[in-house]
Amino acid sequence: MELNELPQMDPRALKATSVKAEDEHANSAEPQALKITAASSNPKMFTLPWHKPLATWPKDLLANLPRGISRHVVRFVHVGDEVYAMKEITRQVAEREYEILRRLQKLELPTVTPIAVVIGRHTREGEPLEAILVTRHLKFSLPYRALFARNLRPDTAERLIDALAVLLVRLHLAGFYWGDVSLSNVLFLRDADAFSAFLVDAETGDLQAQLTDGQREYDIDLARTNIIGELMDLASGKLLPGDVDEIEVGNRLVDRYHSLWSTLTDTDKFNPDEMWKIEQRVNKLNELGFDVDELEMKTAEDGKRVLVRPR
């Protein structure tokens, strides 16, 4: 079937393109025709009602999945056999977040998968609409509020914090400055008796070669403040067990982060007859989800000890 014969096609999609992400120096003028920037094409994307504000999309397109709190309009949309999360934001923010998520994915970090950025959206009357960032829905994941709405174990808050600490350390090791760490910007997956955390919002993030201690500490302090506020909000809604101390849980993130960061980056000193401790440390890191590909080992100046640090 020819493109111009497709039923239910947004007229502006007739001039649409599906391409690789453009260079950052490309023309920043708002396109007059719909433009879908994506790493791979999905023909079903062109049949969606891009001419409508996301909040007004037909219910038959939407997937009834729990959504977290967001500053923007967010909807889960059926696109063929896939379910995509769509967020309506400004073009500049959408394109930047898309690129950051792509880079984080290439580093094999736990984030949602970016699918596309849609710009050049207009109503039938020609009024401009905000861009839409499209990511793949993470199957079986839940936002933190949906987890607390269920009858879970009393230590759920602590387990979520532990998962967030692991995520934050992994991102920081890769040089990612988050800038807005919170439970709201994370999705959680059940992993046996624990949880795994995935980054879903990278609007304020920045990927650098290496973070300074000040950048890391800012992220940690902001995370603590946001988490305490989010848990207090849960408590006011009777969703948090009465014996949970919100401030104590917030402090737990700080403690867990520093403990994990130290385990990953500090140099241990062993006597030559204590080499079994190296395996013990590697096993501990593997249990936390960190693959230790290499160990840097050298003899101390006194010649009696071995210095070991993961690489």
Enumerate the language-model features and the residues they cover:
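Alpha-helical structural motif
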Residues: F140, R216-D219, A223, E246-V249, ...
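A broadly tuned "polar low-complexity/structure-edge" signature
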Residues: M1-A21, T111-V117, A157, T212, ...
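Proline- and acidic/polar-enriched loop/turn elements at helix boundaries
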Residues: A116-V117, L183, M297
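Intrinsic-disorder/low-complexity loop/linker signature
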Residues: G126, D193, D302-K304
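Hydrophobic transmembrane alpha-helix bundles
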Residues: R150-D162, G214-I227, F270-G289
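Regulatory N- and C-terminal appendages and interdomain linkers associated
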Residues: M1-P66, V79-D81, R91-E97, L107, ...
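Conserved ATP-binding subdomain of kinase catalytic cores across diverse folds
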Residues: P43-E158, D162-G179, N226-L234
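Catalytic activation segment of kinase domains across protein kinase-like and atypical kinase folds
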Residues: Y177, L183-D233
